[in-house]
């Protein structure tokens, strides 16, 4: 007998680009496609897990809107952000996996009012990934001998493509290992709505003068690696959904 899909446990998965959602889309069964304000949502199931896969578009505003729609319209129980990121760490090469423990904005500065660089008023210095979800993902990566790093990742509406920009970020955020354009905004929305988040990214470039060319060359590799880890982690996460929902450390 076919196992029933438990639709009460919808998982929202967000990526910015078509390349970043394509592999998961190819795995979707019994899917339908919706478009809201030029944001594409793919509703279906992967390995009998009910998911809403969203292609947000690039940047903080698009990704934030997408996350809010997933939470309000599609009533997802938790969010996974996947896709590519630029490296700020010499040990992270194209294709490397990162699962950030926390994220913040690199293009926010309210230090004149006593806040830390990257901190929004009435919010913490960084937004945290869900502890249990991180542990389950780490367990999968460790058991399958997949190398990864997990520290701070920073986000902003800037593609980092010079050594000067990279050096400035490393100076301002010495603990950051990678940079993208969406994760902090998605985590911010999850934080406001008290929804847990997991971020699974793969490196596409080194955030330097060759970043644009390397991004074009390695985006498919980064998308593939991020997606394959996500697909394999989904089943583990689903088994622990109830625990995850009660282990939320993402509240303002």
Curated annotation (Swiss-Prot):
Q: Annotated pathway, please? A: Amino-acid biosynthesis; L-methionine biosynthesis via salvage pathway; S-methyl-5-thio-alpha-D-ribose 1-phosphate from S-methyl-5'-thioadenosine (hydrolase route): step 1/2
What Gene3D superfamilies does the record point to? Nucleoside phosphorylase domain
Top enzyme class, one word, equals: hydrolase
Query: Which Cys pairs are S-S linked?
Result: none
UniProt keywords (A-Z) are: Amino-acid biosynthesis, Hydrolase, Methionine biosynthesis
According to its UniProt entry, the function of this protein is described as:
Catalyzes the irreversible cleavage of the glycosidic bond in both 5'-methylthioadenosine (MTA) and S-adenosylhomocysteine (SAH/AdoHcy) to adenine and the corresponding thioribose, 5'-methylthioribose and S-ribosylhomocysteine, respectively. Also cleaves 5'-deoxyadenosine, a toxic by-product of radical S-adenosylmethionine (SAM) enzymes, into 5-deoxyribose and adenine. Thus, is required for in vivo function of the radical SAM enzymes biotin synthase and lipoic acid synthase, that are inhibited by 5'-deoxyadenosine accumulation.
Q: Which NCBIfam families match?
A: MTA_SAH-Nsdase (TIGR01704), PRK05584.1 (NF004079)
The protein, known as:
5'-methylthioadenosine/S-adenosylhomocysteine nucleosidase
Q: What is the lineage of its organism?
A: Bacteria, Pseudomonadati, Pseudomonadota, Gammaproteobacteria, Enterobacterales
The gene for this chain is mtnN
